[in-house]
């Protein structure tokens, strides 16, 4: 038995008293938790708007703060009998397994199988034990076709699944997940919910920062509500479930009932396409991931000034199609036309703004303000877009200290300021 597991006998696995954390170069505190106790075996949902402190709290639990995100810690936060900030990430990983918003940031190997067995190897588990767990995971999640896949060929949703399963291969008491379903389709979300249920029955302590709340309704024991970096409310399941849709909306939270969300979407007035002229046409495009053919487009037409949604299950070619449209991939057999004029991949690239699923890969500067204007040929006033996208006041923050939602809005803002003809999200 691992020594860290032996230490966790107290039901109070995580406690905080008068705890405050401030990111380096930040004027105001980034997280304040006055009083909190989380017992072993609970599934706790961290909810609140983007930038409310959810990701910061998880970074403290898994040791990324202060090892990778420097700042000032005040008060007391204790995880499995260890004070926050007193252990290295390596030491914390023996107690806490993590799933990040950006799954590629936690991959070390080229192939899926090697990535899955890495945690057990790092923690000195027996080869037989590792293989037994891998076989069980493979059976439970139908991974047979993925084990030999190159991680770089997976879609965003597929990468997120592998990151989750890699965390599940670890022998830890605590599992923290930062928006684990952000890029998953409905079947993938249901698989996550199913396995979280199993882990909860095994007595694991699970902390999930989420905006999607519907799949957690029957799993959550508590909901921690964060607002502007402060833990404002600690709801029991009964208290949270009794909130009205109006109260939930006022808190900036999504519904627990998907049907009500769908009806609201249907009731919204449809946005008419812009009167701009010009169509983008694709002919004879084969969508591939590595050597695997995903689908074939004989002809596809995209109206200028319109919003087009690419929908489908994970791994079916949505992101791959967007890469071709943006000129990031090239198919010599395919034809691209704008207003009837042939386009090369380079032509597509020059006129396209693109926002990746893994937005951290598009952040290069050391402040939000510099990131917004990076590469622009003319000086622009970014105050309006900062205000509109909820980034006002963050101009001096390092982009990598932002929440996942704030990073995404920052990249969207920087791409919009380029004033390219097409935007792909």
What function would you assign to each model-found segment?
Residues 210-211:
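H-loop/switch region of ABC-family ATPase nucleotide-binding domains
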């Amino acid at each position: 038995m691992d020594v860290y597991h032996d230490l966790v006998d107290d039901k109070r696995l995580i406690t905080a008293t008068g705890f405050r954390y401030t990111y380096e170069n930040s004027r105001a505190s980034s997280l304040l938790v006055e009083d909190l106790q989380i017992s072993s075996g609970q599934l706790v949902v961290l909810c609140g708007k983007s930038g409310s402190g959810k990701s910061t709290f998880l970074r403290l639990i898994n040791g990324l703060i202060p090892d990778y995100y420097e700042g000032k810690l005040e008060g007391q936060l204790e995880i499995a009998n260890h004070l926050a900030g007193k252990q290295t990430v390596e030491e914390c990983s023996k107690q806490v397994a993590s799933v990040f918003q950006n799954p590629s940031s936690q991959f070390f190997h080229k192939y899926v199988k090697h990535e899955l067995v890495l945690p057990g190897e790092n923690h000195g588990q027996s080869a037989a034990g590792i293989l037994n767990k891998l076989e069980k995971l493979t059976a439970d999640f139908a991974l047979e076709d993925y084990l030999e896949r190159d991680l770089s060929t997976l879609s965003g949703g597929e990468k997120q699944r592998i990151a989750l399963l890699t965390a599940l291969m670890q022998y830890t008491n605590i599992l923290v997940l930062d928006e684990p379903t952000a890029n998953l389709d409905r079947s993938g979300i249901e698989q996550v919910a199913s396995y979280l249920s199993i882990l909860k029955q095994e007595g694991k302590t699970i902390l999930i920062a989420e905006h999607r709340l519907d799949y957690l309704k029957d799993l959550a024991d508590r909901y921690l509500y964060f607002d502007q970096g402060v833990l404002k409310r600690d709801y029991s399941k009964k208290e949270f479930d009794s909130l009205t849709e109006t109260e939930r909306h006022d808190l900036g939270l999504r519904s627990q009932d998907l049907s009500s969300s769908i009806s609201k979407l249907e009731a919204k007035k449809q946005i008419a396409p812009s009167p701009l002229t010009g169509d983008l046409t694709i002919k004879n495009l084969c969508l591939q991931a590595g050597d695997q053919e995903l689908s074939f487009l004989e002809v596809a037409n995209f109206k200028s000034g319109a919003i087009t949604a690419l929908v489908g299950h994970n791994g079916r070619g949505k992101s791959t199609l967007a890469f071709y449209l943006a000129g990031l991939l090239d198919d010599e057999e395919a034809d691209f036309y704008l207003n009837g004029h042939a386009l090369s991949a380079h032509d597509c690239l020059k006129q396209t703004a693109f926002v990746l699923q893994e937005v951290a890969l598009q952040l290069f500067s050391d402040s939000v303000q510099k990131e917004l204007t990076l590469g622009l040929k003319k000086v622009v006033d970014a105050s309006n877009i900062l205000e509109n996208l909820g980034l006002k006041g963050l101009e001096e923050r390092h982009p990598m200290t932002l929440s996942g939602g704030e990073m995404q809005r920052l990249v969207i803002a920087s791409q919009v300021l380029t004033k390219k003809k097409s935007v792909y999200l």
